[in-house]
């Protein structure tokens, strides 16, 4: 497949995240490999809908329908770019390809008991305990993406260099594509962040780092990235006896808890950083029936008569 280098430059110009760009390019490479294995034309002008359908079917059999859906979405972007750039005179083949269907997958939520066990696992007073408690509190309280959480900055006196505003009980979080949003936090989360910041101040050279979350390595400090947060959650999950603890489970759990407590979809969209109603509807599916039954028990019209 041609022009992937040019497409990569266009994606970078459009502000796509490195992770998204890797996914896009991987889909084009997977299609190119499929075409080569099956001795099909791989010229961008000659690739047709039938070949792409065959590729997606093969991906469903080899991996999963969800993986095929990712390739479908990414290839729509690629062939759309080719058309806009005038690099393909033939019609966009993706207009004739249907999105692969996948059975709805119920996302596992973290029960309140599991969240309590995780909090207990880091209830000590060490630097790591203070840090991990604050991280857990924010994840439970906001469902923030791990990339936005890891990217929080901190400065004790310069508002332009910090994303932490505890007096206002809110955080400035960077979203996909470079957008920013203000995420509110509750009193317990704010107190946990404050305890961590005080512990952070006692770490040598902590003031030299622009990042809120620090890891300690020997006598130095380093930025705790999203992979570090993932590793911490796995470790704390093992300590607490809670399996499968990862950032996205907190996001699903937060959305479910928000809606179960009567929170509005519009407010959920703002806090989660979503711009369309598709995402809250997707996240709401998992326990939608259970929430509806719980709401009916609270609001039953018949019980008022």
What are these regions (language model features)?
Residues 1-305:
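Conserved catalytic core of the tyrosine transesterase superfamily
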């Amino acid at each position: 497949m041609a022009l992937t280098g040019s497409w990569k430059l266009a994606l970078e110009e459009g502000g796509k995240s490195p992770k998204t760009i890797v996914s896009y390019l991987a889909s084009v490479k997977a299609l190119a490999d499929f075409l080569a294995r099956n001795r099909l034309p791989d010229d961008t002008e000659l690739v047709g809908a039938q070949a792409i359908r065959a590729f997606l079917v093969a991906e469903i059999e080899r991996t999963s329908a969800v993986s095929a859906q990712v390739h479908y979405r990414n290839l729509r972007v690629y062939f759309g770019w080719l058309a806009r750039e005038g690099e393909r005179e033939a019609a966009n083949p993706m207009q004739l390809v249907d999105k692969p269907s996948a059975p709805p997958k119920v996302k596992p939520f973290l029960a309140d008991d599991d969240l309590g066990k995780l909090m207990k696992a880091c209830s000590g007073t060490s630097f790591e305990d203070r840090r991990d408690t604050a991280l857990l509190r924010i994840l439970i309280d906001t469902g923030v993406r791990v990339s936005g959480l890891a990217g929080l900055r901190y400065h004790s006196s310069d508002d332009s260099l910090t994303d932490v505003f505890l007096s206002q009980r809110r955080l400035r979080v960077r979203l996909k594509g470079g957008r920013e949003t203000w995420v509110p936090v509750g009193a317990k989360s704010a107190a946990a962040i404050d305890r961590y910041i005080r512990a952070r101040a006692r770490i040598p050279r902590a003031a030299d780092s622009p990042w809120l979350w620090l890891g300690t390595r020997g006598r130095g400090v380093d930025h705790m990235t999203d992979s570090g947060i993932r590793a911490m959650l796995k470790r704390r999950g093992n300590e607490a006896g809670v399996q499968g603890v990862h950032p996205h489970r907190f996001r699903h759990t937060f959305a479910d808890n928000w809606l179960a407590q009567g929170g509005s979809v519009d407010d959920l969209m703002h806090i989660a950083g979503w711009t369309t109603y598709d995402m809250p509807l997707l996240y709401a599916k998992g326990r939608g029936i259970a929430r509806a039954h719980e709401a009916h028990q609270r609001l039953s019209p018949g019980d008022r008569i």
